[in-house]
Design a protein with these regions (language model features):
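Glycine-rich FAD pyrophosphate-binding loop
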Residues: 61-80
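C-terminal lid/capping helical subdomain adjacent to the catalytic/cofactor pocket in oxidative enzymes
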Residues: 2-4, 8, 33-38, 385-429
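Short beta-strand to alpha-helix junction loop
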Residues: 95-105, 132-138, 176-194, 204, ...
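A short, basic/flexible loop-to-alpha-helix module at the beginning of a structural domain
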Residues: 19-40
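Helical element adjacent to the flavin cofactor pocket in flavoenzyme catalytic cores
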Residues: 175-247
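Beta1/beta-strand and adjacent pyrophosphate-binding region of the FAD-binding site
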Residues: 35-51
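Dinucleotide-binding Rossmann-like beta1-alpha1 core, especially the glycine-rich loop
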Residues: 85-161, 165, 171, 307-308
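Active-site substrate-recognition segment that forms the wall
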Residues: 119-122, 242-243, 247-248, 252-397
Length: 429
């Protein structure tokens, strides 16, 4: 029913820009908002990436009426479909951090869900390799951290053991993480989405949350059809075509989450963390009939990421990446519509070869082809230590019924079901 309501609203709203210009001239914005079509809803989830879908499913399973709003034509077009598709064990993150807790819990939930719902996945294990003497102590730190986080089966291997396990590998020592794995992210999202819809959740695509305000009956969410925002760029500010009045709003918009939160006009922007964006390219291994590796191969973590690593997909295709390219502040249109530059610069491959050959010396010149790129939403910039996930409720920003998720980078995929569980328990009763 609500989907039909939104469709009728879009059909009535062909002159949004002109009405907004007139409103500005008349200084009558509040009156125009009062005349705007309104719809009372229970829960609104902003963003249909893997975290947003998992949150929608969890809320729907608990009997809540859920509307998911996604600016793109379909689900999972952003960070969720542009990552390594790795199920992480939980050994990189400081003990008791949200990343550590949600990764370890999420990994167990994810393996169980995939097994029970036929989602393609494989627990293939990971080797984190020390290729220089200075790396060996870092392996010990990761071992201690992972053990404290409750990661099972971790052990340090001598180089000859690791190279016997992976003949193409070169290293001095390695940390084996047997509980790491891979998953078909699209199939996972499709399964979670189907279950959410089966329990009453509604997914509305090509629809953008452009802001909100606080009224006596709670937070009001401003919504517009995505194509009208593109048409308004340069001509006038976007104007809401529909106002939603929800009991609960969960901002899972990924790269766009901080920008949307700032548009809510109800939050002190000082509580919204500064955002940084790390673009990363992947290159695929060509001219090979079989994978040179059977496990995930990771170097010691680097500034901004986990290093250029070896990832396998479920068809045994090999990809290397991502690298780290810090990009500037996102532009106006990209922030609203989640439209970003995902092109792969072919010349970046020259930096890949020496990085990969540190642990895979037999990599041949010309064997890497451009794959895809992704952008990671970060809360710490170049040269800074990684920052934990941020999940803000009323206790932080003072707005009842609003939950903001910031900096949901890796291990966001692994953590998705645990994050959803946490939000449903803490904020949905």
């Amino acid at each position: 029913m609500l989907r039909h309501m939104l469709q009728r609203t879009w059909e009535r709203s062909t002159s949004i820009c002109s009405r907004w210009i007139i409103s500005n001239k008349m200084n009558n914005q509040s009156q125009l908002l009062e005349r705007n079509p309104k719809e009372i809803v229970d829960c609104v989830v902003i963003g249909a990436g893997v975290v947003g879908i998992a949150v929608a499913r969890e809320l729907a399973l608990r009997g809540r009426d859920v509307l998911v709003i996604e600016s793109a034509p379909t689900f999972g077009t952003g960070t969720s479909s542009r990552n390594s598709e790795v199920i992480h064990a939980g050994l990189y993150y400081p003990p008791n951090s949200l990343k550590a807790v949600f990764c370890v819990r999420g990994r167990k939930l994810l393996y169980n869900y995939c097994s029970n719902h036929g989602v393609p996945h494989k627990q293939i294990g990971k080797l984190i390799v020390a290729t220089g003497s200075a790396d060996i102590q870092k392996l010990n730190v990761l071992l201690d951290r992972g053990t404290e986080n409750g990661v099972e089966g971790l052990r340090i291997m001598e180089g000859y053991e690791a190279m016997r396990m992976e003949p193409e590998l070169q290293c001095l020592k390695a940390l084996l993480s047997p509980s790491s794995g891979i998953v078909d992210t699209h199939s996972l999202m499709l399964s979670l989405l189907g279950e959410a819809e089966n329990h009453g959740a509604t997914f509305c695509y090509n629809t953008t949350v452009i802001g909100g305000h606080l009224n006596r009956d709670g937070i009001h969410i401003h919504v517009s059809e995505s194509k009208n925002i593109e048409n308004c760029i340069g001509g006038c500010p976007p104007y809401p075509e529909l106002t939603l009045i929800p009991n609960l709003v969960v901002n899972c918009a990924g790269l766009s989450a901080p920008y949307i939160a700032k548009r809510f006009n109800v939050i002190d922007i000082r509580v919204i963390p500064t955002s940084y964006y790390a673009r990363g390219c992947y290159f695929t291994l060509s001219n090979t009939t079989s994978s040179p590796f059977r496990h995930l191969i990771y170097p010691i973590p680097e500034d901004g990421g986990l290093g250029v690593h070896v990832t396998l997909d479920l068809d045994d295709h090999v990809k290397f990446g991502p690298d780290v390219e810090w990009v500037g502040e996102l532009d106006y249109l990209s922030s609203f519509l989640n439209k970003f530059d995902y092109s792969v610069c072919a010349n970046r491959v020259e930096k890949f070869y020496p990085e990969i050959r540190r642990y895979y010396p037999n990599l041949k010149d010309g064997s890497l082809e451009p794959g895809y790129a992704g952008i990671r939403p970060k809360l710490s910039g170049p040269g800074k230590s990684p920052v934990d996930f941020v999940i803000q409720g009323e206790d932080i920003h003072g707005v009842h019924g609003l939950v903001n998720l910031f900096g949901i980078e890796s291990p966001g995929l692994t953590s998705s079901m645990a994050i959803a569980e946490h939000i449903a328990f803490k904020f949905a009763g």
